[in-house]
A protein has these predicted regions:
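Surface-exposed ligand/attachment interfaces on beta-rich extracellular proteins
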Residues: 11-45, 147, 346
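Extended, beta-strand-rich, solvent-exposed assembly scaffolds of outer structural proteins
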Residues: 50, 113-204
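Beta-strand-rich, repetitive solenoid scaffolds
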Residues: 27, 36-37, 52-54, 61-64, ...
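Short, solvent-exposed loop/turn segments that connect beta-strands within catalytic domains
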Residues: 134-136, 347-353, 401-403
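Extracytoplasmic/secreted proteins, especially bacterial periplasmic and envelope-associated proteins
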Residues: 151, 155, 159, 336, ...
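Short, compositionally biased
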Residues: 3, 10-22, 48-110, 201, ...
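Structured segments of extracytoplasmic/periplasmic soluble domains
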Residues: 159-167, 344-347, 367-370
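C-terminal, surface-exposed recognition/capping segments
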Residues: 61, 334, 343-344, 361-435
Length: 435
């Protein structure tokens, strides 16, 4: 490890730091010692550290944040995830961007009132094809004559394919939709393969509910508001109010008493005090500060999502081996990421069967904590697995909703949101025991 001396902090800041070895720097004027680490392996991982498997499938923990130099990670190492909590010898790891990124691979719709009398009947089903968007439900109406479930399923498949072609869907999209006979339950199952819509994953990925069970407006997760940088780690109502004076929303319609989708930014103090559209807020909250606290700092449990699961491991055991048929006549795992994690466990020596599983309430709550995000964000950004900016003037440790955190850009004064813990990128949770 190199040891260097600088006359001042300005000289140190101006110097080019090494990218392949660690360095200890002494600032002569202040006698400050600064350690610049590069890919430092540790046996005592903490939140934000990056987890790899070496070429022998051994777990390697590397110090996160500014210590990571992705370009110089050994090519034989596989990036597994990030440490998001540590309790004694137990280490929690988020698995990011692994061999299979999806929680859920199929969406199914049951047609239960199939008539098998050989006469002609008409049936209409509503499906979300993602055309023109995932909020659009398309009616598929067709006639069928069937004496068996298989005949009804074939007619349904033909109707779906024809409707998709009419809508201009690609051949790949058409191939994802089909229907098959569920003889045991005397019904037809309409199936969509390769489910990747973010809203579908966001809810179904953790609870396995179907589109029909999803709320029209899913509940948002709110956390502490305020700006965090490496220079000013202040998170409080006063800062929020100061920013919202000019940066808050000016409502153009009546404000609900709790934030809804699209209303992630609080109204301005002036609007709260005098706008006709804030009458509900003034009647509910005595002060603007109370409005901020109740709407933007208190975290309410979600009706859906990972907070509905008391035990992620129990859910994993229930769902890991569930299969679904394929249009080509084979079978596949319905929850491929869960199967991969729970059944294969990455082949790590000492990692028992089933150590990887879906987050439950405890794991999910930890993932939503702002202090966890503060530690994870620099490492995630350094590894380039999600779009989080962690420069000193741009990171903001506030929950916007279940997937997003705010980014405050100190250069232009604007707020942005980016995925941090994302149901497409974040798969199962691992609980590992260190020696």
């Amino acid at each position: 490890m190199a040891i260097k001396s600088y006359n001042s902090k300005a000289d140190y800041n101006a110097a080019v730091k090494p990218t392949t070895e660690s360095q200890v720097s002494m600032i002569e004027t202040t006698r400050e010692v600064i350690v610049d680490g590069v890919n430092v392996v540790t046996t005592q991982p903490t939140v934000g550290d990056v987890v790899f498997l070496d070429d022998q499938n051994k777990v390697i923990y590397v110090k996160g944040g500014s210590w990571i130099q992705k370009a110089n990670i050994p090519v034989a190492w596989t990036h597994v995830g990030y440490v998001y909590f540590r309790k004694g010898k137990q280490v929690g790891v988020i698995h990011k961007d692994g061999a299979d990124r999806k929680y859920l691979d199929v969406s199914q719709f049951a047609w239960t009132d199939v008539v098998l009398d050989g006469a002609e009947h008409e049936k209409t089903i509503g499906l979300r094809f993602g055309i023109p968007n995932w909020d659009t439900t398309t009616s598929v109406t067709f006639t069928y004559t069937a004496t068996t479930i298989a005949e009804a399923a074939a007619a349904c498949t033909a109707a779906i394919e024809a409707k998709l072609a009419e809508l201009g869907a690609s051949a790949a999209t058409i191939a994802e939709w089909w229907a098959y006979a569920d003889e045991d339950n005397n019904r037809v199952i309409v199936q969509r393969d390769n489910c990747t819509d973010w809203r579908f994953n966001g809810c179904s990925g953790l609870t396995h509910i179907t589109w029909g069970d999803m709320p029209e407006n899913s509940y948002y997760w709110r956390g502490e508001r305020g700006y965090y940088t490496q220079y000013r780690g202040v998170m409080n109502i006063a800062r929020t109010k100061a920013w919202a004076t000019n940066g808050g929303r000016i409502p153009t319609s009546q404000e609900p008493i709790k934030p809804i989708a699209g209303n992630g930014v609080p109204v301005r103090p002036s609007a709260f005090d005098s706008s006709e559209f804030c009458a509900n807020l003034r009647a509910t909250y005595a002060t603007y500060e109370e409005y901020l606290e109740k709407c933007y700092m208190v975290a309410y449990p979600q009706k859906y999502g990972c907070f509905a699961l008391p035990s992620g491991k129990a859910m994993a055991e229930k769902y890991a081996r569930m299969t679904a048929p394929t249009k080509a006549g084979g079978t596949k795992y319905k929850y491929p990421a869960l199967y991969y994690g729970y059944n294969k466990s990455f082949g790590v020596d000492g990692l028992d069967f089933g150590d990887w599983y879906l987050p439950g309430v405890a794991e999910g709550t930890m993932l939503m904590k702002d202090e966890t995000l503060v530690a994870l964000a620099p490492s995630i950004s350094k590894m380039g697995t999600t779009a989080v900016n962690n420069s000193t003037d741009r990171w903001c440790a506030e929950r916007y909703n279940v997937d997003n955190a705010w980014i405050f850009n100190g250069n232009d004064g604007n707020l942005y949101t980016y995925y941090v813990v994302n149901s497409v990128r974040c798969q199962a949770v691992a609980l590992l025991n260190i020696d």
